[in-house]
């Protein structure tokens, strides 16, 4: 849990107003913006662009690009609807808490952003960001966190597809991820105590580690380098581990394992071990655990 502390209150307060003009509060500094609405027929862009050290509390956003190039900001108890497109780009040192955020392309090329207790529906959320922490939140997104670095996620309910592709240095714990094509081309990712549901999990990843996870879906974990599974279960998983360098300790049954490239896969039972149409050396070993004797067949 992040337990975000927002910035200290400021003497300058802007309260209970509506803004609709372009750059309405441009370069605002050391201020609190409270119970304000950013909407109207003027349809102005970039209402809070280039702000510094501000708190935005209980505000409504329905205009494009509201918080670009913001530095040291808190966004608390606020809402952004679908008209608030690309709302937070090139921002740094931000804290987002208890918000309902709907704008497409939320967070792009941002640095040091904390998100907690939020509900987010934003296709293309979090692209090319660095130092992102997310906790106790719900996110629906396609291409979640594409090509981002240094990410910590805890207690996330996530739904979408093509998630975490090309990410590096990611840690996820106690989360539910319902997403196809997750972790493709990722590097140095650890997922703990989580449910990971969706087809084609983790292809072409490097240094992907799953610990105490429930893995669900067809053809997972193929073409991986240095893949590790510790105390995981696998459901509806067929054609797993094709051409992967893998060391895995799996509890329960796997439908089928195909052409593991190297390493050892320990499993309670497997429906089929497939070794055919091999395009490269497939020297991985599959061992069946016989728990009552603690030996392997």
Model features per residue range: what roles?
Residues 1-297:
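Long, distal/terminal scaffolding or interaction modules
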